[in-house]
């Protein structure tokens, strides 16, 4: 006996790729001393800075932005900036990357508090990075 089935209908949904990271430039975790201040820099890629322990200041285009433990900020391409400690020994996590997606405009000049239950995602990124890449020790003079 031949089995006759119904013709199934499938619906295809196009996935919108709102953010496309073309390249990872750097990924590193820095344990800074209490008097640390980086050199001012500018570059043609994005940078995400996350304060993992203690607070830091991000100075961008001359404006000081306090970054508390558990907060992150995006530095847009070609924005002058530097990082400095606030009298304690902070730890920061930095990912710099190339992304030309229009959706990145959403992150211009914003900082975010990362909820405790999402911080593990940043830890997973760092873990994957150390398993995948050779990450040199942090040199504060670079």
Regions found by a protein language model. Give the residues of each.
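Generic protein-terminus/edge-of-domain signal
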Residues: 1-60, 65-66
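Short acidic-glycine-tyrosine-enriched beta hairpin
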Residues: 62-77
């Amino acid at each position: 006996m031949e089995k006759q089935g119904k013709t199934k209908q499938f619906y295809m949904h196009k996935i919108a790729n709102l953010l496309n990271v073309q390249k990872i430039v750097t990924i590193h975790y820095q344990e800074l001393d209490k008097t640390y201040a980086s050199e001012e820099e500018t570059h043609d890629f994005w940078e995400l800075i996350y304060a993992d322990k203690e607070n830091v200041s991000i100075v961008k285009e001359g404006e000081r932005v306090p970054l508390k433990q558990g907060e992150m900020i995006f530095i847009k391409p070609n924005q002058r900036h530097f990082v400095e400690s606030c009298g304690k020994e902070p730890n920061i996590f930095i990912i710099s990357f190339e992304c030309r997606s229009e959706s990145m405009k959403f992150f211009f000049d914003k900082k975010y508090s990362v909820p405790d239950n999402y911080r593990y995602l940043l830890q997973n990124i760092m873990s994957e990075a150390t398993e995948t890449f050779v990450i040199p020790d942090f040199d504060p003079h670079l």
